[in-house]
Amino acid sequence: MPRIIKHLGRVDYEPTWRAMQAFTDSRGAETRDELWVVEHPPVFTQGLAGKPEHLLQQNDVPVVKTDRGGQITYHGPGQLVVYLLVDFKRMHVGVRELVRRIEQAIIDMLAEQGIAANGDVDAPGVYVDGAKIASLGLRIKNGATYHGLSLNVDMDLTPFSWINPCGYANLKVTQMKNLGVNLTVAEAADKLLPHLERHLSTSKETA
């Protein structure tokens, strides 16, 4: 079944998260997968493993405790967020392979823009010369995923210095703009989505 792509624009984090939960709770065997393309106003989200000490500096950015995996991260304008509402039982792959495919989609998209990036088996996400450019966080429920990925496109990276991103002290972050690629979030989405569609194919051979 073809996936439904929804471009939702700039939306608040918490109601979007609640909508993902509701979608996942109500989906059935024939429900089509959806990819939600969004930006968020400034917000820190703290995953199930999140520890308060990873918020290093008090500030005006709200902190939302959420139900994805992982630690604390930052979302803000100029960052592409894609939520993956996927029945991964249909793909006949495990969670680790699903994460690898999402990472590879981002790596392939960045390569097209002349950016050499890589994953890290010990720390999910995508990195350029050791600096994180994309983060992943998923929740699995009844064989389906929600939450997803964030890719730094053209944003103010300062709030990342107020946290230990993803729980790692002194982790550097980067973005496409700093690497010489000037795209809007919408343009970055248009370039990433075909790679996501390909890597989320149900066929193991085509990923």
UniProtKB/Swiss-Prot annotation:
GO terms for molecular function: lipoyl(octanoyl) transferase activity. Pathway: Protein modification; protein lipoylation via endogenous pathway; protein N(6)-(lipoyl)lysine from octanoyl-[acyl-carrier-protein]: step 1/2. PROSITE patterns: BPL_LPL_CATALYTIC, LIPB. Keywords: Acyltransferase, Cytoplasm, Transferase. It holds the Pfam family LplA-B_cat. The record marks K132 as: Lowers pKa of active site Cys. GO terms for cellular component: cytoplasm. Its EC number is 2.3.1.181. It catalyses: octanoyl-[ACP] + L-lysyl-[protein] = N(6)-octanoyl-L-lysyl-[protein] + holo-[ACP] + H(+). The active site is at C166. The keyword Iron-sulfur does not apply. Substrate binds at R68, G69, G70, Q71, I72, T73, Y74, H75, S135, L136, G137, G148, L149, S150. The keyword Cytoplasm applies. CDD domains: LipB. Belongs to the LipB family. In the reaction, the free carboxyl group of octanoic acid is attached via an amide linkage to the epsilon-amino group of a specific lysine residue of lipoyl domains of lipoate-dependent enzymes. This is Octanoyltransferase. It comes from Chromobacterium violaceum (strain ATCC 12472 / DSM 30191 / JCM 1249 / CCUG 213 / NBRC 12614 / NCIMB 9131 / NCTC 9757 / MK).
